Amino acid sequence: MRDIIDINSNDNVLFVTSQCNNRCIMCCQPPSKVNDLDRNFEKNMKIVSSAPKELISLGITGGEPTLLGDRLFTLINHIKAELPNTEIHLLSNGRAFSNMLFAKKLKECGTDKILIGIPLHSDCAADHNYIAQDTNAFEETLQGLYNLERCGFDVELRVVLNKVTCKRLPQMANFIYRNLPFVRYISLMGLEYTGFTIKNHDIVWIDPLEYQNELEKATLELARWGLNVSIFNLPHCVLKKSLWKYSVKSISDWKNEYAEFCDECLMKDNCCGLFATSRRQSEGLKPITEIQCD
């Protein structure tokens, strides 16, 4: 994470805390018990004050940013005052918003120019709670999503693709369509092989080649139902061609890289590339040197 704003970066974020009330088994940045809330709050307020006014977007992340409590709203109001044209992307597990009073406090900051990204790991409560390592996570996250919708916020639903989540991707798509049709975006996200993913390799790691059928079915059905679905963090060479148009260049510039053979690939300019931070990559990586017409 940077401590300054780079106007040319695709990943300007305010890091609120390393603490989290989830302990997700594939977390790329494992939580800490260190109390860094005060220090980071003061630092972030200064970063916002010195940020260029033409900044397009600014993320708020952690850990879990809502652990900042009411000071989260102070920070957001400060952003809106200093950077009125900047889009705010708040990443949260959503659980704090199960308290409608907390959701309404965020609403008082204004619902414009703010997108809230929340992960949902499964349509099955047991799977979601297992991944989050908390028995209340699924219920509180769902209630948080509903409360944010009632307050008028745009929500990005995030699904991190791993061995646990991939087995039920088609069912997950159906669950989203029936229960969460109001979400603005659905982001299906490839796994970054670092942090807890390394520790829990046998539980969470799956080569993207192995879940392409499930990913294709889920993605195409969500799109057919009129929902805005995208695929993050998976290079074109491991995706079915039918999914290329849903793939976006999503990896933060400071941890984005391409293999040497990617220079030979016809799709490099459209491809997200690879996580430089990942200790393991798909066996399917290869340059695309020929594109057959459908």
Stretches found by the model and what they are:
Residues M1-N10, N228-W254:
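Short, charged low-complexity linear segments at domain edges
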Residues I4-F41, K268:
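Canonical Radical SAM [4Fe-4S] cluster-binding loop centered on the CxxxCxxC motif
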Residues C28-R39, K53-L68, K80-S98, G110-L142, ...:
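Core AdoMet radical
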Residues K46-T66, K286-D294:
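Short Fe-S-cluster ligation motifs
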Residues L58, K113-I116, E139-H201, E210-H236:
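Conserved C-terminal portion of the radical SAM core fold
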Residues D70-N77, S98-E108, K167-F175:
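Distinct, well-ordered alpha-helical segments
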Residues N77-K80, K167-V183, L239-N256:
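Short, electropositive alpha-helical surface patch
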Residues K240-D294:
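Flexible mid-to-C-terminal extensions adjoining Fe-S/redox cofactors in radical SAM and related proteins
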